[in-house]
Amino acid sequence: MPPSLTREEVVPSRKRIKLPPWLEVAKPRLIPLLLATTLGGMALTEGWPLSSPRLVCTLGGGALAAAAAGVLNCLWEQELDGRMLRTSGRALPSGRLSPSAAFVGAVSCTLAAAALLVSGVNCLAAGLSLLGLCSYVLLYTALLKPRTTQNIVVGGVAGAIPPLVGAAAATGHIGLGGWWLFALVMVWTPAHFWALALLLHDDYRAVGIPMLPVVKGPLVTTRAIRRYGWATILLSFLGIWALPEGGALYGLLILPFNGRLLQMVERLAAEPNNRDRAKGLFRWSILYLFGVCLLLVMSRMSGAAQFDLQVRAVVDILSGGFLTVAS
């Protein structure tokens, strides 16, 4: 496979926006997708829509917890980042931000997140947010990432917790809808991340991180991506039943998203060494998850409920006609 792309070539927005060091270590570009899945978790409950104060506290607390996790991840990996050309210019390894300042920022964000979620939402949402933080830093970054090719499969639990936070914020408990979106994000994560790992495999190899493309090569990796891509598509259709209402609209609108994801997964599987295919899948997978969450929210609007009733009426008429003919 040709040499790895730089992260800037994969995510070109980094060339256009120079963040201050204290914000850079919080990894703010990852936060919007986490908040989108939080909203998706809310939309899957009977508690939707939330009051404005509760919504703001949930998203604000989630953003602070995610920022704290990003800072702690950077602190843990600063020596590793300093050994890679791609990451050596980051705030901590380059010396633009001191570790002590970063640690104080991480603790402050954690405490602020906990206070906001406990006071403005509920203890379950606060506890789940802190669980997500700990699982990202301890389970994924410290334990799994340097030890196994399946690091992102198990470690992906950290990124899948926000839907549970959203469901807990809306109702005070986690219903089946929240668990469905948790599972969807879990199976979405490997295909998304391994597409990026294909592009950055030389960096991971240089520092001894056993990502799947490094250990098994592109052929095995793209086959695994294909399996998880198919699992994501199949699982996504369960959202039709996971939604309290509006499932028919969601089921209709998810079709083009799944069609495009399937196309990109199959193209990469057919050309394991094609860097453009891997880059395209990585980028589309982000838009895909944003799209799923947007559809979940749209499906809870009043017009979607009407569409649901109309579809059910048509199905009842068709099924009644079929039974009449059959008899």
Curated annotation (Swiss-Prot):
HAMAP family named in the record: CyoE_CtaB
Entry EC no(s): 2.5.1.141
Cell location: Cell inner membrane
Organism of origin: Synechococcus sp. (strain CC9311)
Role noted for this protein: Converts heme B (protoheme IX) to heme O by substitution of the vinyl group on carbon 2 of heme B porphyrin ring with a hydroxyethyl farnesyl side group.
GO molecular function, a single term: protoheme IX farnesyltransferase activity
GO cellular component: plasma membrane
Extra remark beyond the main annotation: Carbon 2 of the heme B porphyrin ring is defined according to the Fischer nomenclature.
Enzyme class: transferase
Similarity annotation: Belongs to the UbiA prenyltransferase family. Protoheme IX farnesyltransferase subfamily.
CDD domains linked: PT_UbiA_Cox10
Annotated catalysed reactions: heme b + (2E,6E)-farnesyl diphosphate + H2O = Fe(II)-heme o + diphosphate
Membrane topology designation: Multi-pass membrane protein
Main location: membrane
The entry's keywords: Cell inner membrane, Cell membrane, Heme biosynthesis, Membrane, Transferase, Transmembrane, Transmembrane helix
Protein name: Protoheme IX farnesyltransferase
Protein's pathway: Porphyrin-containing compound metabolism; heme O biosynthesis; heme O from protoheme: step 1/1
Transmembrane segments: 55-75, 101-121, 124-144, 152-172, 180-200, 237-257, 278-298
Any one GO biological process: heme O biosynthetic process
